[in-house]
Amino acid sequence: MKHFFTILGGLLLALAGGAEEPEFYVGACTHFAQNKGTPSQNLEMAAHAGIVSIRDEVSWQRVERQKGKLVIPDYFGKYLDEAVKRGIRPLIIFDYGNRFYDGGNYPASDEALEGFARYCEAIVRYAGDRVKLYQVWNEWDGGCGMRGYGRGTPEGYVKLLKTVYPRLKKIAPDAIIISNSVCTGEKFLENTFRLGVLDYCDAIGFHTYNYTLLHTPVEAWFKRMQNLRKLIHSYNGGKDKPVFITEMGYPNHLSNSGSSEEESAIKLARLYLYARTLPFLKGLYWYDFQDDGWNSAHNENNFGLVRADLTPKLPYFAMKSLAARLSRAELLESETRDGLLLLRFRNGKEQFLAAINQRPGVDLQLIFTDTGSSRDALTLELVGSAPLTRSWGFRDWTARKAEVIPNQLSVTVGEMPLLLSGNVEKVRLTEVRPHAFDRTRLVKTAGLRLPAAFAEVLPAGETAQTMPFGTYRQLTDSRYGGLNDLSAGFRANYTRDALLLELEVKDNVFHQPETAIETAWKGDSIQLAFQCIGAPFSVRTEIDAALIGGKPAVMVRAAQGDRSRVPQCRIERRGERTVVYHLTIPARLFGLKAFDSGAMLTGSLLINDNDGNGRKGFLSWGSGIGIHKDPGLYNLFIFK
């Protein structure tokens, strides 16, 4: 079956106001504004890899350091110049609060909105022709860069964008203004659509991280993007709206959610090739260009295409194989056959083929036929590897056939996509032969990670040991005052049908300003996360509980089993300082029939702390919840 596509490159060219712009922005995120990396060296390597755009920032706080006085920092112009002279197009983010307006919170007052707009205007005027791509905020919905202020609302963001967009277009009518990079999913994005965000931007920003869903193939991302297009059509009169994926990546940290360099390279290659089949996608920015540090267990230190000292990683070479090609290429044809996706691109006057194997556990042998008469040798390139020359002629010697077919060529594609270039205009796919090759059966060295702590879960009626919460994570400038500020302990028992938890919290100030359990994490509350031993990384059970308006409230955020089995929750106040949470959590919620002696669960427990000025931190037993979701950092529950 064949499908033919015409890439809507003209739409983007019209937006960008110049024929020199790429068909597609193959980009990478940098952190020059955070004083990370060396712009000249980083950008030289980015250009060598064929990357045509970088995404960086110059924050409001750095520009307006005295109220009413806007001064563009020198580093901004320097990294712009370094990028532009290498043919790299910067995408610049306008972001984050300023302490002179609304106390540093999300800009909402008229004064703050005006201040933010002035800052944006100053950046656009300063950048001039060096920048055509701008994004109004980064992860407004996720709280990035806004420590202590929680997450922004759809209403607040659309109000901001309505203020800023027309003023920027007046200064730079050819600029492409991209909306906030939504990171919490389609629900928030759709809420902004309802509020009219599509009328106040030239393109939609979206972040699509799924690396914590360890067994999720790139094809699931591709399906998600197709569904995103349908969502846009439903609010845009059945028409496309350009979309930029301004962050996507697979970090190489040593954790259950980490990918090996080889896995990241494979995912990168498949991701960019799939992206080029979607005409509404105008750019995809890999996060990150450079590792942020050397901590092998920390995701942010291991997202890069290159190490912290610029040593290339395997994904860098995959990017080098594809970036220059895909940024200028036009998709001519897409063919699917027997689990193969074969893409035919035109880049200038030449064509090239890209083969993607979509069948897990199988390698695909591809037989090509030259229907012309040239028999020119072709260039074969496994993405990320050195190209080599292949001449025509195929002998099926494994089937004991002696004859050579002079106008045929055989290549095999596994997980990593494969490229064929040269005189391929009259080259056609003749046959696809599957060969079983299940890489999940490869014997690999297994690492053993022992939990940092464990708790015994005793049968109901027996006195369980009280386990203290020992780690406080500070999120704002308000310092943790020790045990007199916040302390907690828990006991765990069980019946065959349920896990029984009692958490006793002593807090010098109890404050819960929220009216809904979904956002109760912003105030004094608890969050629990569990995983059954041997479960896939992405499958876990998460529970929130809080005292809201004097009444207990509980919700299930995620479940390994029957989500309708909501835990019973009783919360009691003991004087001014003590709150006790009693939870009965059904075994069925974990996907278990019953709890028995010898059973084990991994899990983490968290106490949120708000003394009246926002969520200032949390106390935890175990990690992997509160900042990043990582069941590999949970502690252990042992049922006695």
Q: Which ranges hold each PLM region?
A:
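Structural preference for beta-rich elements and adjacent junctions enriched in aromatics
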Residues: 433-640
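Active-site cleft segment of glycoside hydrolase catalytic domains centered on the general acid/base Glu
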Residues: 35-38, 64-67, 72-75, 101-230, ...
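N-terminal substrate-binding region of glycoside hydrolase catalytic domains
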Residues: 20-122, 135, 141, 470-473
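C-terminal beta-strand-rich structural cap/linker in extracellular carbohydrate-active enzymes
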Residues: 394-437
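Hydrophobic h-region of N-terminal signal peptides that target proteins for export
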Residues: 9-18
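Aromatic/acidic polysaccharide-binding cleft in carbohydrate-active enzymes
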Residues: 250-319, 335-337
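Carbohydrate-binding surface patches
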Residues: 336-384, 577
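Conserved, mostly hydrophobic/aromatic
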Residues: 54, 83, 123, 134, ...
